[in-house]
């Protein structure tokens, strides 16, 4: 799968993924049904994005990238009591990170503070094109920008890009509140909407029983008066709603006179206290798509039953064509994970994790902090594909994509997680050798580095057994192993403490067995990693694992009972000295152990330096191995 795409050029058909939605888009492109393909990613800013959102981001931005289109980032912010600027900022950062270098030239954003009223003369021109014009006039986009994208290549990677990014912001459904209100008034005037005085519980009961509201046949004049007074703040929350007048007996409950406006006396993160009536999702969604010129509105399957309402609202407002159309695909359900915002919020609020970006969380910020790359997430989304059928995706599919990606990019390093001291008695005291070690065997251009070797080294406790099991090929009394990049050593003596625990091994080395030596080709069955004791750098290593112990933790009962008590273990490791120069988010393979990343909690190059590393993933699927035993 190619990740490079010339700015402004669609991806060749033979290089595009194929699924039922892309097939529809390809047909529309061939028919020239729309001037340009225009998708959107519209999260509600009431929580952090998770890996399920990553699938949708990859689909919507992927289609824009492949067909030379645009994908708007829009905040679906119609519920003031649950939304916050914190979530807007995290969502924007996560989206930019995930599409960086892949589809960032397709990112639809707008000049900060601009709305349709301030950009266009009539409130219904192509908002996106107007935004591009404003950016060019402001110097945010160059005049010869070859793409019609309203974003620059605005990432977190450089001062110029940061400056441009600071002058852009997502689209907001709340920017359209004036227009949405006028659309609601238009429905009232056509006899297609009415103000209802039923309580929320009564409304639910009436709709369930296909029963007509006693307020359904109010006059247009009365409805207009009441709706105006609702807007003016004359009524308390929950006392009145505006409902679409469709069919109370419809077999589709979403068409049974659905609510399209409700009263909420609450401060809004974007509009302040200007409004006390707010549109419902189904009303704002389709009209926001229309205002922005969206062609393909792609949702998950639970919104399939909402599509008739989406179409009804657009058609009954007599809007100029073309109209957007909604398409649905199966959402991501991932094994050993929960993705309900409510349940993730419980984990955070009950301090069962350290926060939204805890590396065990399925949030994009958590996954990123764990060391997973955007490329790995996009590869995962590509591998699972797009279907119409819900099903559980094995987490091993995600883990395979992560390992495959990191194997190619991660620098190799020697680190001992649980050290035991080894003294090589026939190696000269005070001597240090610089040995050559490969940085990445998958990448010849990564070159080599020097690692120090001395008389005393650390090895893993698990690499020594006083009484070894069958087929144990690592170090044991009288046994030999090769220290990677160094010598073959033989265990001659054990040193134990007062409790009888082995605390030191005394070994001799075959000093001719190093590369280039007379016995370098001598074979032994085991090769282990090590770190020179006198040169080791201490690090806090956080060994993260799956957060839950079962594939479907929320299938029944309290999901928290399936939390993995061993999902985090913290050890003080001994690292080769090159890691003291590491920077946050650099990724490594600790040889024979797994993939690790420098955590943002690290205090680097300070007087009280502290190196902290997170385990991204083990080298092999240890869960599959355990499952085979049961």
Spans of model-derived segments:
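Intrinsic disorder/low-complexity segments
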Residues: 3-4, 8-10, 109-167, 602-610
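N-terminal catalytic cores of NTP/NDP-binding nucleotidyl/phosphoryl-transfer enzymes
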Residues: 14-26, 30-93, 268-300
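Secondary-structure transition/capping motifs at alpha-helix termini
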Residues: 30-33, 62-70, 94-107, 190, ...
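Conserved short loop/turn motifs at secondary-structure junctions
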Residues: 42-46, 74-84, 110-112, 168-178, ...
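Active-site cores that bind ATP or allylic diphosphates and position pyrophosphate for catalysis
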Residues: 79, 85, 114-121, 125-131, ...
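A glycine-rich helix N-cap at a beta->alpha junction
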Residues: 88-123, 168-174, 184
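Core subunits and conserved enzymes of cellular information-processing
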Residues: 303, 307, 311-313, 375-378, ...
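Long, charged, mostly alpha-helical binding arms that flank functional sites
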Residues: 322-401
């Amino acid at each position: 799968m190619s990740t490079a795409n010339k700015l402004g050029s669609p991806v060749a058909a033979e290089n595009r993924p194929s699924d039922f939605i892309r097939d529809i888009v390809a047909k529309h492109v061939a028919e020239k049904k729309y001037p340009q393909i225009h998708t959107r990613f519209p999260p509600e800013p009431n929580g952090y994005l998770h890996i399920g959102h990553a699938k949708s981001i990859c689909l919507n931005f992927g289609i824009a990238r492949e067909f030379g289109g645009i994908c708007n980032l829009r905040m679906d912010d119609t519920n003031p009591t649950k939304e916050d600027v914190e979530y807007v900022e995290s969502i924007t950062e996560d989206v930019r990170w995930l599409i960086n270098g892949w589809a960032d030239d397709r990112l639809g954003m707008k000049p900060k503070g601009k709305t349709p009223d301030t950009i266009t003369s009539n409130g219904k021109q192509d908002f996106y094109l107007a935004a591009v014009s404003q950016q060019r006039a402001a110097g945010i986009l160059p005049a010869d920008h070859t793409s019609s994208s309203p974003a620059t290549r605005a990432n977190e990677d450089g001062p110029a890009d940061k400056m441009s990014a600071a002058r852009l912001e997502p689209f907001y459904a709340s920017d359209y509140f004036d227009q949405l209100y006028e659309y609601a008034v238009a429905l009232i005037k056509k006899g297609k909407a009415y103000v209802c005085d039923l309580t929320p519980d009564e409304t639910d009961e009436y709709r369930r029983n296909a029963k007509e509201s006693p307020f359904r046949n109010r006059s247009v004049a009365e409805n207009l008066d009441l709706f105006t007074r609702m807007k003016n703040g004359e009524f308390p929350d929950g006392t009145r709603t505006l409902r679409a007048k469709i069919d109370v007996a419809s077999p589709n409950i979403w068409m049974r006179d659905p609510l399209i406006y409700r009263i909420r006396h609450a401060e809004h993160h974007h509009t302040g206290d200007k409004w006390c009536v707010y549109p419902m999702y189904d009303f704002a969604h389709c009209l926001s798509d229309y205002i922005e010129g969206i062609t393909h509105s792609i949702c998950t399957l639970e919104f399939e039953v909402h599509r008739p309402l989406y179409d009804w609202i657009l058609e009954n407002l007599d809007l100029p064509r073309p109209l957007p159309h909604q398409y649905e695909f199966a959402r991501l359900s991932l094994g050993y994970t929960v993705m309900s915002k409510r349940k993730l919020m419980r984990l955070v609020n009950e301090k069962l994790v350290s926060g939204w970006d805890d590396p065990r969380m399925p949030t994009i910020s958590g996954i990123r902090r764990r060391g997973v790359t955007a490329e790995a997430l996009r590869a995962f989304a590509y591998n699972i594909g797009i279907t119409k059928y819900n099903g559980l995706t094995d987490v091993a599919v995600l883990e395979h994509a992560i390992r495959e990606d990191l194997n190619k990019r991660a620098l190799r390093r020697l680190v001992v997680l649980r050290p035991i001291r080894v003294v090589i008695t026939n190696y000269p005291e005070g001597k240090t050798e610089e040995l050559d070690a490969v940085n990445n065997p998958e990448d010849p251009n990564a070159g080599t580095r020097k690692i120090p070797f001395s008389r005393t080294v650390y090895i893993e406790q698990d690499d020594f057994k006083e009484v070894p099991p069958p087929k144990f090929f690592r170090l044991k009394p009288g046994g030999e192993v090769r220290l990677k990049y160094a010598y073959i050593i033989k265990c001659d003596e054990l040193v134990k403490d007062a409790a009888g625990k082995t605390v030191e091994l005394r070994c001799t080395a075959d000093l001719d067995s190093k590369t280039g030596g007379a016995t370098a080709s001598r074979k032994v069955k085991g090769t282990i990693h090590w770190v020179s004791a006198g040169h080791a750098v201490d690090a806090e290593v956080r060994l993260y694992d799956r957060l839950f112990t079962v594939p479907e933790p929320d299938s029944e009962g309290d999901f928290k009972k399936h939390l993995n008590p061993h999902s985090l273990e913290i050890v003080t490791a001994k690292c080769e000295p090159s890691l003291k120069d590491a920077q946050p988010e650099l990724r490594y393979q600790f040889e024979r152990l797994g993939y690790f990343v420098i955590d943002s909690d690290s205090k680097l190059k300070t007087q009280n330096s502290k190196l902290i590393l997170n385990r991204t993933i083990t080298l092999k699927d240890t869960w599959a191995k355990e499952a085979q035993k049961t």
